């Protein structure tokens, strides 16, 4: 099951919080709010790609909408003299309606290389810029593992390098327990638009295990840092001849007698 389903959806309600949190009063309102949430997310993911938006969470009541944006470069969303954020607020207000009270919060993420969406977008951008596929995937693997991830899996599908027949290419590094529900697996999918067609990019990142109860937004690699390995004790070298040379039987007897004599003198 872990290999088939969306890794985020499998963990919602267990160790991941829902990205849309609201209760609609009717089926019609449910459909309306779902479309609005998708438009709000596309506003950030498509129009503000340079800001490296990792996630957009939305909370609603009947009269209010709270939008939480997590980005690697929030300054690009805010803009000089708050011009961009004012523009974004107006666009979201048009989507949800003028009568709804809107609250927009922009947060900076500490480890952008541990976000699957940012990594997938980087690979898609590299493919669109005609970077060799193998090097683009290898660079992504190296960045993620250096950032402290326990494992990463990358799957690219489509007409790779302009081939006539579509195929898949996959790289896996480290540990990737997709069926372990307490594992903090972050999954994202992006599209690279090329002259040969659309190439799909899927990224899974293993950020460690979550043992705490409840829905915690703090990444596992911060909650449970890996223990440092203890250094092996060093043995001090002695100045005795026995430790440095191969000794004969008579030499060993002489050395042991000398050690006994020194011992007796110390006791006296």
From Swiss-Prot:
Q: Where is the KH type-2 domain?
A: 40-110
Record carries keyword Ribosomal protein? yes
Cellular component, GO, one term? cytosolic small ribosomal subunit
Tell me which UniProt keywords the record has, alphabetically: Ribonucleoprotein, Ribosomal protein, RNA-binding, rRNA-binding
Q: One Pfam family this chain carries? A: KH_2
Which cysteines share a disulfide bond? Answer: none
Supply the InterPro entries for this chain.
KH_dom (IPR004087), KH_dom-like_a/b (IPR015946), KH_dom_type_2 (IPR004044), KH_sf_prok-type (IPR009019), Ribosomal_S3_C_sf (IPR036419), Ribosomal_uS3_bac-typ (IPR005704), Ribosomal_uS3_C (IPR001351), Ribosomal_uS3_CS (IPR018280)
Instruction: Determine the domain of life of the protein's source.
Output: Bacteria
Question: What GO molecular function terms would the record report?
Answer: mRNA binding; rRNA binding; structural constituent of ribosome
GO BP terms: namely: translation
Outline the subunit composition: Part of the 30S ribosomal subunit. Forms a tight complex with proteins S10 and S14.
Q: What does this protein do?
A: Binds the lower part of the 30S subunit head. Binds mRNA in the 70S ribosome, positioning it for translation.
Q: Sorted alphabetically, which NCBIfam families does this protein's record hold? A: rpsC_bact
Similarity section: Belongs to the universal ribosomal protein uS3 family.
**Protein name from the UniProt record:** Small ribosomal subunit protein uS3
Which source organism does the UniProt entry give? Mycoplasma genitalium (strain ATCC 33530 / DSM 19775 / NCTC 10195 / G37)
State the taxonomy lineage: Bacteria, Bacillati, Mycoplasmatota, Mycoplasmoidales, Mycoplasmoidaceae
* Encoding gene (name): rpsC
């Amino acid at each position: 099951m872990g290999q088939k389903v969306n890794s985020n959806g499998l963990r919602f309600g267990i160790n991941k919080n829902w990205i849309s949190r609201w209760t609609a009063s009717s089926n019609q309102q449910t459909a309306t709010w779902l479309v609005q949430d998708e438009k709000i997310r596309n506003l950030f993911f498509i129009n503000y790609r340079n800001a490296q938006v990792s996630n957009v969470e939305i909370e609603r009541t009947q009269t209010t909408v709270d939008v939480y944006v997590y980005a690697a470069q929030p300054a690009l969303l805010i803009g000089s003299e708050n011009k961009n954020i004012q523009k974004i607020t107006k666009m979201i207000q048009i989507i949800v309606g003028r009568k709804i009270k809107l609250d927009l919060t922009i947060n900076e993420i500490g480890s952008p290389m541990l976000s699957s969406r940012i990594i997938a977008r980087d690979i898609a951008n590299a493919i669109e810029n005609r970077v060799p596929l193998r090097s683009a995937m290898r660079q992504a693997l190296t960045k993620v593992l250096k950032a402290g991830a326990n494992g990463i899996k990358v799957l690219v599908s489509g007409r790779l390098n302009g081939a006539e027949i579509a195929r898949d290419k996959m790289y896996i590094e480290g540990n990737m327990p997709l069926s372990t529900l307490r594992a903090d697996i972050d999954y994202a999918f992006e599209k690279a638009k090329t002259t040969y067609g659309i190439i799909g990019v899927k990224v899974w990142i293993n950020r460690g295990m979550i043992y705490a109860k409840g829905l915690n937004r703090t990444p596992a690699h911060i909650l449970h840092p890996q223990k440092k390995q203890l250094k092996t004790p060093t043995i001090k070298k002695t100045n005795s001849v026995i430790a440095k040379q191969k000794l004969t039987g008579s030499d060993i007897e002489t050395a042991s007698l000398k050690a006994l004599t020194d011992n007796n003198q110390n006791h006296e």
